[in-house]
A protein has these predicted regions:
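Active-site beta-strand termini and strand-to-loop segments that position acidic
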Residues: 109, 156-159
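Short histidine-centered loop motifs in beta-beta connectors
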Residues: 117-121, 125-126, 158-188
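Conserved beta-strand positions that form and line the central face of beta-propeller blades
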Residues: 106, 155, 165
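Surface-exposed, glycine-biased beta-strand/turn segments
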Residues: 1-152, 185
Length: 189
């Protein structure tokens, strides 16, 4: 089957995205002040190229071939609306009349998405080693439509200064590690 995106609602409003960025930078400044920031924001002192692994894995013992699908990619065409360009020169992305261009990769649980979520059979893992620089949990996680509800998320900064945003996570399922803690590539988030 196919699901058609209805209204191209961004995952986060501009205000929510700005709040996340502000929280990230406040945490980075706090970690820096406490001499706990593992990665410098000074380009000269950053590490080399970071290679990413895949952020979703099936739980141990699950006999499915896999537990994910992709519904949308980053929109690399800054024009809008309906000016789409994904990484493969295709149009598997979206934008909106407001000027929003999709800024992430939408990975969903499949097959039986709710069952996989309810039984914790799909796991979100770190794509690369890094430091947790923000996280938020306890938000509603059972939306059946595309919206911009506040999400459950973990944000990890890597050696090159890049920051991976892991959003739309199951409420109460986030790692027990705290802001400032280190995670390794493939570690449960």
């Amino acid at each position: 089957g196919e699901f058609k995106l209805g209204n191209n609602t961004p995952c986060l409003t501009d205000a929510q995205r700005n709040d996340v960025k502000q929280s990230i930078w406040q945490n980075i400044e706090k970690l820096r002040a406490e001499n706990k920031l593992m990665y410098s924001d000074n380009e000269v002192n950053r590490g080399g190229q970071v290679l990413f692994n895949w952020p979703v894995q099936k739980a141990a013992g699950l006999e499915y071939n896999d537990v994910w699908g992709i519904s949308g990619y980053v929109d690399h065409n800054p024009a809008y609306p309906n000016q789409l360009l994904d990484y493969n020169c295709g149009s598997r992305t979206y934008d909106a009349q407001s000027g929003y261009n999709h800024a992430g990769v939408d990975i969903f649980t499949w097959p039986f998405g709710w069952k996989l979520m309810d039984t914790s059979q799909a796991e979100i893992v770190a794509v690369a080693s890094g430091q947790i620089i923000a996280k938020g949990d306890g938000q509603y996680d059972r939306s059946c439509n595309f919206n911009n509800n506040v999400w459950n998320a973990v944000y990890v900064q890597h050696a090159d200064g890049s920051i991976a945003w892991y959003g739309h996570m199951k409420s109460g399922s986030l790692t027990s590690k705290q802001v400032g803690d280190f995670v390794t590539s493939g570690e449960y988030l």
